[in-house]
């Protein structure tokens, strides 16, 4: 079991945490959704390093006057509370967070959630949705982009999440071929 855990951690690091292509997928989805004013947005990552890598990539590549922040378990309590409060009040356009965001957080202005965490947990998947579906007069629809990564193990997780969403009666649109034809799509480098 220890060997399997090391394998999974390395797979996750190589495929997601340290993979510039994975950052570009998140960036492309944000750019696409920003055209339709789907901000504020929350990007959920699994690990601290992934969270920081995505944040740095977005900060260095997104155009415009966007307020981008990140929060994870190592963020000091006082700073974390301020970031969460600013995001809740619409002062932060894009928040990149680890899964600590899953429980007990209320973000009524949130319009877009990008799940970049690639986890196989029905409970966490549904908890993420809970951050998104809070009602507010400023929104009539919400959007969830769930990034499905390549490789048998991670693809299986993505398929499971899609099944969880369908059980919740969500309209699931797979981008697959449509996304590959989209003008904003950048091909996979491999």
Question: What does each of the following model-derived ranges do?
Answer:
Residues 1-41:
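Conserved interdomain linker/interface between the two RecA-like ATPase lobes of SF2 helicase motors
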Residues 95-101, 113-120, 146:
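Conserved helicase core region in the C-terminal RecA-like lobe
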Residues 106-109:
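Short glycine/proline-enriched turns and hinge-like loops at secondary-structure junctions
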Residues 24, 52, 56, 81, ...:
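Alpha-helical elements of the RecA-like P-loop NTPase motor core of helicases
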Residues 40-42, 52-59, 65-102:
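Conserved helicase ATPase core of P-loop NTP-dependent helicases/translocases
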Residues 46-49:
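Conserved Walker A/P-loop ATP-binding site and its immediately adjacent core
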Residues 120-143:
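Conserved SF2 helicase motif VI
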Residues 136-190:
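C-terminal helicase lobe
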